[in-house]
Amino acid sequence: MSRRRHSDENDGGQPHKRRKTSDANETEDHLESLICKVGEKSACSLESNLEGLAGVLEADLPNYKSKILRLLCTVARLLPEKLTIYTTLVGLLNARNYNFGGEFVEAMIRQLKESLKANNYNEAVYLVRFLSDLVNCHVIAAPSMVAMFENFVSVTQEEDVPQVRRDWYVYAFLSSLPWVGKELYEKKDAEMDRIFANTESYLKRRQKTHVPMLQVWTADKPHPQEEYLDCLWAQIQKLKKDRWQERHILRPYLAFDSILCEALQHNLPPFTPPPHTEDSVYPMPRVIFRMFDYTDDPEGPVMPGSHSVERFVIEENLHCIIKSHWKERKTCAAQLVSYPGKNKIPLNYHIVEVIFAELFQLPAPPHIDVMYTTLLIELCKLQPGSLPQVLAQATEMLYMRLDTMNTTCVDRFINWFSHHLSNFQFRWSWEDWSDCLSQDPESPKPKFVREVLEKCMRLSYHQRILDIVPPTFSALCPANPTCIYKYGDESSNSLPGHSVALCLAVAFKSKATNDEIFSILKDVPNPNQDDDDDEGFSFNPLKIEVFVQTLLHLAAKSFSHSFSALAKFHEVFKTLAESDEGKLHVLRVMFEVWRNHPQMIAVLVDKMIRTQIVDCAAVANWIFSSELSRDFTRLFVWEILHSTIRKMNKHVLKIQKELEEAKEKLARQHKRRSDDDDRSSDRKDGVLEEQIERLQEKVESAQSEQKNLFLVIFQRFIMILTEHLVRCETDGTSVLTPWYKNCIERLQQIFLQHHQIIQQYMVTLENLLFTAELDPHILAVFQQFCALQA
């Protein structure tokens, strides 16, 4: 006893307080676990688990109400695949505690407003859907939900707002109807008919210029590539025609109907959609990806038709599972294969279709590409007897439809397939694709196989690739990735610069300094120099050729050796590549040396940009140069260009961030300054203001470079496409060659992959390049891009 009293006297009973805090934290963690895990595998039925959990939460409401409210709002937003489980739980709590139900509805409306304000429109859709399902659980009165949807659809009447804003509010309304349409129509049929009429009127008049840019395939056979709102409208129309009967949504609240129907309902507070502002960023439109139908799995359960609302519900739930668990591939795969009602549908077909729908989504997949590869590998391990066969069937279908597949999606298909093969000993029935051997090498199928084998080599080695494919495929196999050194054999003795190359080789091996290399290069004659030009500073292609060829040849052992060589002789590179022609020639020579090793080319270009040996505009000009025309449609070329653009964008963002931080620091300094005359503060302000001025200049310079890079790229695209179109018109041949398809879709790809940056320069692009006089084929791409956020 005395020990306890001594403790109480000395620290005021703190251990007791800590114990109370610890107990409270444990209880909160326990509540979080119970709420998050409800609906997962359990010995008891879902209904009894929900009833038990409602009892536990009700008992804890007096002490943990705010925590419970916060948790339920969070799961409504983040676990949409368990939507009806949580709405039932809220319904049971509302039946037991009416005030809590009201507070929950208010909290959800607050969260919805915050999500819309923060441009979290995808989460806002789930919140709207959750609120609508609360009508089924007798938490929210149907008339107030109808009034909210009426306000949503009234956005279609707004003037001077982007179409994507109107689209989102229509989508939020339509996508909730599979859950609540029946209940709303029973209670308020006249009002619902009016909302439907307004929706139909809007859908008929909205523009769909953007659709070609977002389609995975240009052909509509065997499956139409429908715009997402058109497809959803058709599904809802069919559902309405079927008297709102759907057979796939889990509705646990039906088991509690006798309890829930006695509960008092809440009216939603009047909800006015927040007005459009300059900062509003709405989701882009989409095109619905279709790959399978009921004929693809004749023996299993029937796959719902493309305009069946069950197809929408299943796909939506699978997308939600991936969204919730994409960071944990094992959990994600397990959740997908244990999907409720899996025995009623061909689940593996749905899973594979949904994963490819995300992987091929334009402009970008929801998650990083490699996630889909690892998820499919995990699914193959979980379902070894069935899923690999469906995946092989899907791969075959994609291969068969390569002729009309969007080039960006072909790139992703190449990257996925090569990575997938590397995890399964590169086993594939290549003979089944031997039809590609008799086709034009530039047509999509042989091109696809060549690119896949090249990517496989990056994940393996050259001889392994030769061993895995039949000898008949040798023409499509990648070249041996060795260095080509033009001064290396006896026949090169007569080449200009040969003797200097030998001297350089000796100097490099002797660990020569930059000055010693300059001394050796000093006497290299300049084929471009006039006899009366004594300056010696003009661009000297031979000097660059001898130096770059010899250095890269001696450093060819590995990436690391090459990087070390660039670093050691950085000063020489910078001097030789001082002019724009010099930078371009360094890239040309590097390409000649490593022509057979695309990966080495990519990493060397990356390193040269980072170390400022070449700039981004030089890389863009090199890619569109005549020297690269033979390789212009190869994947590695476009990977280099996109990597170059990303580097430029990161550079601009980095300086902008530094400027913002400096401005914030100055603002904080002003705030802290006392009323006294503090001269040291003035001095600090002066230093910061100078720094801000310098950073402002750097930002403007970087943005100018960024704009110039895009101008160079688009200008070169316009030039080569115009040349092709004129040539075809002159010769009387078809414009639609494999080269043209690839090139015009690469132009689309630039717009899509960098849309957020390019939108800053739209006025400049429209005034300087994409003018009304431009050929309609090229101008159409720009117009499609403009329509994406119109």
Curated annotation (Swiss-Prot):
Span list, region Disordered: 1-26
Xref: Gene3D superfamilies: 1.25.40.180
GO BP annotations listed: 7-methylguanosine mRNA capping; alternative mRNA splicing, via spliceosome; cap-dependent translational initiation; defense response to virus; histone mRNA metabolic process; miRNA-mediated post-transcriptional gene silencing; mRNA 3'-end processing; mRNA export from nucleus
Keyword terms: Acetylation, Coiled coil, Cytoplasm, Isopeptide bond, mRNA capping, mRNA processing, mRNA splicing, mRNA transport, Nonsense-mediated mRNA decay, Nucleus, Phosphoprotein, RNA-mediated gene silencing, Translation regulation, Transport, Ubl conjugation
Keyword set includes Transmembrane: no
SMART domains, A to Z: MIF4G
Pfam families: MIF4G, MIF4G_like, MIF4G_like_2
Residue ranges that the Swiss-Prot or TrEMBL entry lists as coiled coil: 643-713
Domain MIF4G: 28-240
Residue ranges of the TM segments: none
Residue list for modification Phosphothreonine: 21
Presence of the UniProt keyword Nucleus in the record: yes
Assembly notes: Component of the nuclear cap-binding complex (CBC), a heterodimer composed of NCBP1/CBP80 and NCBP2/CBP20 that interacts with m7GpppG-capped RNA. Found in a U snRNA export complex containing PHAX/RNUXA, NCBP1/CBP80, NCBP2/CBP20, RAN, XPO1 and m7G-capped RNA. Identified in a IGF2BP1-dependent mRNP granule complex containing untranslated mRNAs. Interacts with PHAX/RNUXA, SRRT/ARS2, EIF4G2, IGF2BP1, HNRNPF, HNRNPH1, KIAA0427/CTIF, PARN, DROSHA, UPF1 and ALYREF/THOC4.
PANTHER family linked: CAP BINDING PROTEIN, NUCLEAR CAP-BINDING PROTEIN SUBUNIT 1
Name of the protein this chain belongs to: Nuclear cap-binding protein subunit 1
